[in-house]
Amino acid sequence: MKKKAIGHAGWLWTGLASIVAFIYFFPVLFIILTAFRSRMDTLATPPKWIFTPTFENFYHIFFRAMANSTEYVSTGFHVYFFNSIYISGMSVLLALLIGTLAAYGFSRHPLRGNDTYLFIILTTRMLPPIIVIVPIFLIFRITGLAGTYTGIILMYTAFNLPFSIWMMKSFFDELNTEIEDASRMDGASERSVFFGICIPQVKAGLAATSVFALILTWNEFLFSLLLTNKLTRTMPPAMARTIGGEINVDYGLLAA
C-alpha cells in the first residue's frame, strides 16, 4: 500500500513538473512557430496553429527587395553577425585580460584606500549609458574613433572592465594563499605564482566572467547604434533597422 502511494505521488510530481516545463517552454515554441509563419498568418487573430510553413522570413533576413523592382539585394546581415562575433570576442578578451590582472593586484597586493578604488571602479558601471553617451560620442568624433572597430572594441572593453574586476577579485579572494606563499619562499616569481598557481584555480571564474561579459556585449544596443556605421554595426541595431519601425513591426522576421 505504501509503495502504491509513493508511485501515485511520483506520477503527480512528474505531471506537475511537465506542466511547469511546458509553461516555460511555450514562449520559445511560439517564437519558433512564428518564424515559419507568413506575414498574414503572423498577424492573424486568433493565432493560427495549423498553417503552411514558409522559409521567407529566414530569406528576408539576408536579402531584401529593391524599391519598385523584383530584384533582391543583400541586407548585409552576415556582416553584422561577423561584427558582433569579432567585436564581442575582442572586447571580452581584453576586459578579461586587464580585469584579471587588476583583480589579482587588488586581491593580493592591496593599496591604501583599496576599497575606495574598488568603489570608484564600480560606480563607473552604475552610470546609465545614456548619461555618458554624449561626451563619449564627442570624444570619439574628435579622435576619429567613431565608426571604427578599434573605437567600439575599446568602448565595450571599458564597459565590461568594472564587472570583470569585481567578479575575478571575488574568485581570487576565495583561494588559499598558503600555496602561493610557499612558492614564493622557494624562489618563485610573482609571474610564476600568478600563471602557474592562481590562474589554474580560477578557470571557472574566467569562464563565468567571459560568458556574462559576452552576453552584455552581444546584447548592447545604444553604443553600437551611435558609435558605429554601416560597416561596423552589430546585430542589435541591425535587427532594429531590418525588422521594422515603431508601428510596423515584422514579427516573423523578429522571431527568425
Task: Label the model's feature ranges.
Residues K2-A256:
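A structural signal for multi-pass alpha-helical bundles of membrane permease subunits
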